[in-house]
Amino acid sequence: MKRIFLIVLDSCGIGEEPDAAEFGDVGSNTLRACAASPEFDMRNLISYGLGDLDGVDYLPKAAQPKAALARLQERSRGKDTTIGHWEIAGIVSERPLPTYPNGFPEDVLRPFREQTGRGVLCNKPYSGTEVIKDYGEEHLKTGDLIVYTSADSVFQIAAHESIVPDEQLYDYCRIARKILNGEHGVGRVIARPFEGEWPFHRTPRRHDFSIEPPQQTVLDAIVAAGKDMIAVGKIHDIFAGRGMTEFVYTTGNTDGLAKTMAYADKEFTGLCFVNLVDFDMLYGHRRDPDGYARALHEFDAWLPDFLARLGEDDMVIITADHGCDPTYLKHTDHTREYIPMIALGKQVRPVNLGTRPGFCDIAATVAELLDVPYETPGRSFAHEIV
């Protein structure tokens, strides 16, 4: 293959994994929840074979499937963006990244206060939209930073743009990133700027400061082989800027799709790795199945035109990184789910590979298809689909 587009529909899981009970996610199924919405319309992907995936018995089967299909089970101990993307890129994480259900300890907060010169508000798990509603006015009065976390391995800093300009907030995040290492090496430090008057609203100028992957990823291998590795959306931040030759941020799914389409019209040799974040950020965590379904339709409607631009030696792999069931009311966090692997292209054989153990099979497959040497626990399915 000359070009592979790897598109992550962030949080679009396809049903609980066998160990879902250990994560508090029994019964979760993101795609099924969206399929029950009156806004759901994925006619193109259904015609390619979406309903033929293992466990997706609530969607019609394709008359003549066009895609190579697999349901992938996570091997890593986690259900967050970082762990999921790392595994897609070839790394299995035996231990989950640290989480803070009781807030961050003083040995983290003390140096953070000293180095930023600002106090800290909240310091506990919180919804991102609720935390600015509940602490925003106190933040405006005091200038103290709103620090909070979630069920994921994250240290989030919210600040009003009139009090803390974005670049200063990013500097505070860099300070936190240096403090949060070793036993407190959280997956991501996230800048969460907000604006307006109470109840306030978050801006799209969020920025993630990720911990570096602990081993080489397939991204590193692609760059080492002298090929292109293009990151679209938050891929740059998830991998801490490592293993890429070019990157572009996006303001949301619509922008991400437009930028991905533009890369389809450009010459390159290697991988274009795309994250579409709105599914997770705007609809999954906010438990909005209709919004999620509309976003899935937007992607589905975009896909045929994109496929028409692919050449003989091109392929697209559509997948996810975890679940975030928009109807799951026991919590508002990610859900431990299988993910889809849907491969399309002129050379792709329509074959169903069933259920496979490991998101890392994608990394092994990408490496083989691009003829890039890379060692991963994953098993390539390249020879089965082309």
What residues fall within each predicted segment?
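Feature captures the catalytic ectodomains and active-site-proximal regions of enzymes
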Residues: 1-386
